[in-house]
Every structure is written in structure tokens, then in C-alpha cells.
Amino acid sequence: MSLEDSLRSLSLDYLNLLINGQAFSDVTFSVEGRLVHAHRCILAARSLFFRKFFCGPDPPPPSGNLDSPGGPRVNSPRPGGVIPVNSVGYEVFLLMLQFLYSGQVSIVPQKHEPRPNCGERACWHTHCTSAVDLALDTLAAARYFGVEQLALLTQKQLASMVEKASIEDVMKVLLASRKQDMHQLWTTCSHLVAKSGLPPEVLAKHLPIDIVAKIEELRLKSTLARRSLIPHHHHHHHHHGHHDMGAAADLEDQKIRRMRRALDSSDVELVKLMVMGEGLNLDEALALPYAVENCSREVVKALLELGAADVNYPSGPSGKTPLHIAAEMVSPDMVAVLLDHHADPNVRTVDGVTPLDILRTLTSDFLFKGAVPGLTHIEPNKLRLCLELVQSAALVMSREEGNANANSSNNNNAPCSAATPIYPPMNEDHNSSSSNANLNLDSRLVYLNLGAAQMSGDDDSSHGSHREAMNQAMYHHHHSHDY
């Protein structure tokens, strides 16, 4: 067993203590009228807040309270007493405990489940108002209870969410980031609000006046930076540069909105006219990622055939390409049409993730967890087909690179050309053999087990109840697909 497997097993063992409720529990919390059983030693070891709360020098009173205004109480409740928690909700408290017990947590609601503040049916809750609210509440709880690792994880999640969230939600995160001195998140959100084009009088209805002033300052700096790249031949034009650039930015925003409406109505000809007549840049407008996520295969194909969009253009802070997005959607049609137009299956995001990595992770989760609520959107046959398509494309590219390298070697060493194989021997190139072995293993794994994993949930009586407990609403997995 590898070190990673050992740590994962240890994490699950501790998490099972929390899931099993009263087993070996020596402390009970009351959150929103519901009891949560936990273990003092684990909480004290993982959180300075709980360490002070449970191990204070004063005699324990009949009951404790985690919500004292001066910070963590040093008074500990007597064994058997119920500790009321009023500062956070039940779901957020369980998410925090899950992180304290296992070191892992997914700070998003389960996909497709009904949520407050989200009226969209079948929403994936990756960047909707409900998902943003849950992340903000989790961040506040992590800061309140001094769980800094969870706070950092939540900040990273929010930074990913706001790229696709509504401008109202971005402003909520902006306020929270200033209140809690989260400078990187502040920078991300302030630039998004600045680029939104909302006039100051509208921003002032949602934000304090000093923040509105900072947003306007950002806009001015951005305008000046763009002006510095453009030669000015007339003093009059220079004098009115700020106004002209602001108008140009508004015009670009209008173009993007028109483009999206055209794509929504499958009017690719209008998009073509905008490219040819108005100079619309499809890559900067994120036309292809938008079409992959919101339009039909035919629209995506027609857009690619215009020849004006880079199929491998990285978009958003994560650097995901359209193929990454199609892989997360588990859409064989989209994956196929992108690969047909030379999408690169080996391209990596900023975090080093390839489309093949995404599909492998989904396959692993599906096989391990079965068709739990968080994975119900995945159809085994579609996942298998997506994996096969991307694997095949990766293998073809690997062989083409091998041919190119072999030909280059032959040209440089003509006398040795007869002894140079077209493909390097598998045992001489560890990386190549590892990659091909992984492809073959993935293929066999999907063929043999993917369909069975979905059907065997009811038959596996020895592990069924345990797996069901492991996949309660507060223990779910997330694959974000922002761009």
C-alpha cells in the first residue's frame, strides 16, 4: 500500500467515527435543533479553538456555549452536556467537522438537489447563488473556529466560482473578502466588478462608497494602460481618450452579448458577420467555451468551421480549454467534435490537469461511489465513450510524436537509420510505457466495471449501508468547470 493510500485509509477511518454518530462520542453539539455527536480528542488536536474550549483551566460549568462574543470560551462543558451552536448552520457545521476529521471536504451543494436561492431545475450548483452562499458561510465558520486550512481551501473555491457567478454574487464575495482581509480574492472580485460595466450609481446601491471609488480607480488604470498601447496623433483625441476607451469597452461587451444571443439561437452566420465585419475576437469573447457548455453539437461544429476560434485556447484563471469543459460535462458529442477539429487531449490547466485526468477522476469516483446523488448526472456509457475518445486521441498524438522523433533521429544519424525503431521500445521509455499502460488499464477498468458499478449497489449488502452513510448530503465530491 502506497503512502497516499495509507493516508486516504486513515482519513476515511476518522471520518467513519463522525458518520457513525454516537460510537465512542464524548461530546454533543446542538445545531439548528439537531444533535451532532463528536470526539473531543480529535477536535482538540485539529483546532486551537476547540483545544482552548475543552482544555481550559476553569472548572467546567453545567453547559458550554461556542458562541460567546469574546471568542472561544475556555470553560468546558461537563461530559454528557449538550453544547448549543448558534453561530453557524447545521450543514456548514458538518462540513467543518468533516474537514477536521478527514482533512478533506467539498464546499459545494450536491448537483441537481433543490436549494434555497437557486430556482434552476437540475442546477449543478457550481457557481449559482446557493453555492456561493454556502462557500461564504463555510469561510465565515472556518475563520470563526480558527480552521485556517479550511479557510484557504474555501477562498480557492470562491475564486473559481466568481469567474462564472452573477455580478451580484461577485459583489457579495467582494464585501466578504474586504471584511476578512483576503487580498487575493479581493483582487479577483474587484477586477471582475470593474469589467462588468455597471455604472457607479448602480454599484453604489450594492457596495460602500469607498469600494465604488476603488472600482472606478481600477477602471481608470485599465483605461490608461490600454491607451498607452495606442498611438495618439492628435491632441484632441488624447484629451478624449478616456471617454473613447470607455465607449470601446462598452461596445465590446455589447458584441459579446449579441454573440451569445446568436449562439443561443444557432445563428452562426451572424457570428461570422460579426467576426468579419466588426472584428469580434472569438477567443477573447470565450465563444467556444460558451457554445460547448450551452449550445448544440451542430453549433459548436459550425463555430469551429469558421476557422476563427482556437480550439485549444485556455480561458479563465484555471486555463481550461473547451475539451476540459466537454470532459467535465461527460458529453461524447462535444468531445468528438472538438477532437475532430484537433483539440489537444494532453493540454494542461494551470493546475496541471488534462482532459484525460478529468475523465479518469470521474470514472474513479463513479466506480468507488456508485450512482450516488452527486454523480447521478453521469451515464456510464457516455463516460466510457468519452474516456475512449480522449484516450485514443492521446495515443495517436503519442505515436505521431514518436514518429516525428524517430524521423528526426534518422535524419541526424543516417548510417544508424536501419537500427532505429519507429516507436521507442516500451521498456526503454518509462513515461511512455506508464502512459500507455494507464490508457489500457483505464479502458479495461471501464469496460469491466463501469456498468456493473451502477447495478451492484443493491446487491452488495455487506457494504451498501456503509457506502450510503459515506454519501450523505454533507459528504459529496465536486468537479468544477469554470472558464
Curated annotation (Swiss-Prot):
Chief localisation class: nucleus
Ranges of biased composition (kind: Low complexity): 403-419
Origin: domain of life: Eukaryota
Amino-acid positions noted as binding Zn(2+) in the UniProt annotation, renumbered to this chain: C118, C123, H125, C128
Stretches assigned to the BTB domain: 25-109
Effect of a null allele: Normal stem and root length. The Ljnbcl mutant exhibits many developmental defects including strong modification of flower development (i.e. abnormal floral zygomorphy with symmetric lateral and ventral petals and altered floral organs number) leading to almost complete sterility. Altered abscission of senescing leaves, of corolla and reproductive organs in aborted flowers, and of petals in developing fruits, even after complete pod senescence and dehiscence.
Pathway membership: Protein modification; protein ubiquitination
Zn-finger segments (C2HC NPR-type): 115-129
Segments for region (Disordered): 401-437
Gene Ontology biological process: induced systemic resistance, jasmonic acid mediated signaling pathway; nodulation; plant organ development; regulation of DNA-templated transcription; response to symbiotic bacterium
ANK repeats: from-to residues: 254-283, 284-313, 318-347, 351-385
Pfam families listed in its UniProt record: Ank_2, BTB, DUF3420
Upregulating conditions: Accumulates after rhizobial inoculation with M.loti, peaking after two weeks and leading to the formation of root nodules.
Record keyword Amino-acid biosynthesis present: no
Gene3D superfamilies (UniProt xref): Ankyrin repeat-containing domain (1.25.40.20), Potassium Channel Kv1.1, Chain A (3.30.710.10)
Keyword Membrane found: yes
Remaining remarks: Fruit abscission does not occur in Lotus japonicus.
Domain comment in the entry: The BTB/POZ domain mediates the interaction with some component of ubiquitin ligase complexes.
Quaternary context: Homodimer. Interacts with APP1 around the plasma membrane and in the nucleus; this interaction disturbs APP1-mediated regulation of the nuclear transcription factor Y subunit (NF-YA1).
Family: Belongs to the plant 'ANKYRIN-BTB/POZ' family. 'NOOT-BOP-COCH-like' (NBCL) subfamily.
Protein's name according to its UniProt entry: BTB/POZ domain and ankyrin repeat-containing protein NBCL
